Amino acid sequence: MNEYAPLRLHVPEPTGRPGCQTDFSYLRLNDAGQARKPPVDVDAADTADLSYSLVRVLDEQGDAQGPWAEDIDPQILRQGMRAMLKTRIFDSRMVVAQRQKKMSFYMQSLGEEAIGSGQALALNRTDMCFPTYRQQSILMARDVSLVEMICQLLSNERDPLKGRQLPIMYSVREAGFFTISGNLATQFVQAVGWAMASAIKGDTKIASAWIGDGATAESDFHTALTFAHVYRAPVILNVVNNQWAISTFQAIAGGESTTFAGRGVGCGIASLRVDGNDFVAVYAASRWAAERARRGLGPSLIEWVTYRAGPHSTSDDPSKYRPADDWSHFPLGDPIARLKQHLIKIGHWSEEEHQATTAEFEAAVIAAQKEAEQYGTLANGHIPSAASMFEDVYKEMPDHLRRQRQELGV
């Protein structure tokens, strides 16, 4: 007689479903200011505790607490606030434009604005970011033209990518923003390779790689960590844990009773787990990781704990798989509201300025959209010739494409 019970496959389940409020206790939160700040030359193994705790600076009253509460220039905080506000207003307007069938698709970053903007302001513009489709706040922090961004979304005749990328797959070299790929996890290995090349050339530029919680299940994630560790690549490896990979709960990729940051330590990489809705913590952690990279001390992995407040995309309905009011119960709050509270408390923002800035960006986005739509929209605009599909792909067109173009008669 077999002494063992039949085996059962374990499949992680979300702690909340429609009609049932989410239990967020799995997040392992601690109070602001409790996480220690190690020296930049810390050994990776000595960051194990930081990969399971949470670096937080702003408390519930809006005060900066603990060793990560750096003396940040208030102008940086103001730039961060403006970038986050602009991102949120831009996102809201573009979702409406998609519903009006002016573009085919859109993905907003509602609730995640601090992560991209905070790191963008902590890096140099010459550093290269390898983002996913939810880091448009990097572009906002670096003042990229709203008209150019909207033309890409509309796939119109002024689209710098000529309609060959999905909307929101921007490519802005002059802003240190590498071409977004629709294939998940590819940018992680690309960033490590770019960082290795920078080191080989003896340059001073570093790379910043981005990935979502779900895509960490891809093999490219593990390949990137291996190469980054072995060659001490000057790269920041960002894992945005927004709790959901489309409709799949984050534990399906990350497992239970562990963290994504813990994987970095296991690969010999100094790792942090950070409150991604705390702009001050984002900026401080990003500066720490950038300093490690610039000093030749190797890569750092940062898990940003945040929440995808909106749908995965305009093709998604999150009410089918999670509580409709989930974001209102998320314990780390709204990044804009938290930084606003802090700035007002230190005397560098006001309710009046907040309203004025909101109105400023609403007007700017509306004006940029009107200008961009003059070059066409998805529903109304120039239709490229069949010949254009062969252009601007290769510097010198190869023979097989010449033959194909001749067969089409274009």
UniProtKB/Swiss-Prot annotation:
GO terms for molecular function: 3-methyl-2-oxobutanoate dehydrogenase (2-methylpropanoyl-transferring) activity. Its cofactor is thiamine diphosphate. This is 2-oxoisovalerate dehydrogenase subunit alpha. Belongs to the BCKDHA family. InterPro entries: Alpha-ketoacid_DH_E1_comp, DH_E1, Oxoisoval_DH_suAlpha_N_dom, THDP-binding. The branched-chain alpha-keto dehydrogenase complex catalyzes the overall conversion of alpha-keto acids to acyl-CoA and CO(2). It contains multiple copies of three enzymatic components: branched-chain alpha-keto acid decarboxylase (E1), lipoamide acyltransferase (E2) and lipoamide dehydrogenase (E3). Its EC number is 1.2.4.4. Heterodimer of an alpha and a beta chain. It catalyses: N(6)-[(R)-lipoyl]-L-lysyl-[protein] + 3-methyl-2-oxobutanoate + H(+) = N(6)-[(R)-S(8)-2-methylpropanoyldihydrolipoyl]-L-lysyl-[protein] + CO2. It is an enzyme of class 1 (oxidoreductase). GO terms for biological process: branched-chain amino acid catabolic process. The keyword Oxidoreductase applies. Keywords: Oxidoreductase, Thiamine pyrophosphate.
